[in-house]
């Protein structure tokens, strides 16, 4: 069953594209019409393609792998952070650091530095250094947390990316493509859909449109993870029953 309804998408403004003069011709198959100089997205196609994307996201999440949520534009950053944290997924909602994927080992060093400063605050180290040194370390930590806090617990490359605004996040898109990491994205009428593996034709500027899509992604991940945990618990119980039965037969 679909997580979306056409009326719900209309209320969220998912159908509003960009000015027709700013369009990408490759988005023509997903455009319903032009109205007052603005392209209107075909929501029937959005509905189908969003459902296909969510099924693929569910398949990834059900294996325990991570999906990184990316959206650094003003309208998206709070939504990305809230929904990613709710789903327990890594995210980037501030600046995308070049090499965040392609040079992940170096990024991990910065994360370790961030965690080291965090430990200094609690293990007594701060009591043994000057006020100026403490201030410098706290400023360094704040900067690292702002940029890397969303991936602090990410120990390996994500299995996929979900992106809001592929034009703005072009560096993230380029890095993911170079590594063969699947890309799910909201793709507006001014974007190149060829850069994305799972296209969701949608308004990537309106807050309600972004929230609708990102929340659906988070809900899908949470449901898939919950089902995975249930299946693992059942498997453990079955294994324990078999072990108990084997012990009983040997007595």
UniProtKB/Swiss-Prot annotation:
The lineage of its organism: Bacteria, Pseudomonadati, Chlorobiota, Chlorobiia, Chlorobiales. GO terms for biological process: translation. Keywords: Ribonucleoprotein, Ribosomal protein. This is Small ribosomal subunit protein uS2. One of its GO terms (molecular function) is structural constituent of ribosome. Pfam families: Ribosomal_S2 (PF00318). Residues 232-251 are annotated as: Disordered. It comes from Chlorobaculum parvum (strain DSM 263 / NCIMB 8327) (Chlorobium vibrioforme subsp. thiosulfatophilum). It comes from the Bacteria. Disulfide bonds: none annotated. GO terms for cellular component: cytosolic small ribosomal subunit. Belongs to the universal ribosomal protein uS2 family. CDD domains: RPS2. The keyword Cytoplasm does not apply.
